[in-house]
Amino acid sequence: MVVHLGTLIAVAASESQQRPPRVRMTGSERRHQLINIARTLFAERGYESTSVEEVAQRAGVSKPVVYEHFGGKEGLYAVVVDREMSALLDGITSSLTNNRYRPRVETVVLALLTYVEERTDGFRLLLRDSPAAISSGTYSSLINDAVSQVSSILAGDFSRRGLDPDLAPLYAQALVGSVSMAAQWWLDVREPKKEVVAAHLVNLCWNGLTH
């Protein structure tokens, strides 16, 4: 079998064009790039269907570079999830500055929707089941934290109104549960505006269907 030199050159050129060019980066820049690529892949395909090889290929580096930064796929996934959890929790925590109960709850809801809007891949990632080896940093654990915070807010409001504060956890579960489901729905439709969604969700839980 005779292979012409011109054919070999053409094939090599084609393969070179298909590979993303390797850009020289600092260690921190490369790490940030790998995290962003992995976040997109994990959000689209989940943990099991994402490979270190594909992350490396999209970044234009070899697999050892990924292992050098994260130790493996599990380590990479843990870093990505931890960053998304931190981003969401920071947004929620910073919204808890209003001393009035209802506006404070509404700003928490709006903070979640803002995260969904600005970090869509991150939210999709958090909604996916984490591998068994990574027990922390799951969306369910975040929801539990949110229930605890909202329960504390509602308990204070119930006491002020002369209502039984022991019922606050029940209402907190209902509020956070409805907000969580609505956020997952809004993730795809993006209508109406997040401010309108937040206002209606809080009004529904605060006043019921009569208002």
Predicted regions and their residues:
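N-terminal intrinsically disordered/low-complexity leader segments
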Residues: M1-E29, F158, P165
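Helix-turn-helix
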Residues: Q33, I37, L41-G75, V79
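Short, structured helix-loop boundary elements
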Residues: R31-H32, V52, E74, A78, ...
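Amphipathic C-terminal alpha-helical segment
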Residues: Y115-E118, S152, G156, A172-P192, ...
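Short secondary-structure transition hinges
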Residues: G75, T107, T114-S152, S159-P165, ...
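Amphipathic alpha-helical packing segments from all-alpha helical-bundle domains
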Residues: S86-L89, S135-R160, P169-Q173, V196-A199, ...
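Hydrophobic alpha-helical connector segments
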Residues: V79, T93-E118, A172, A198
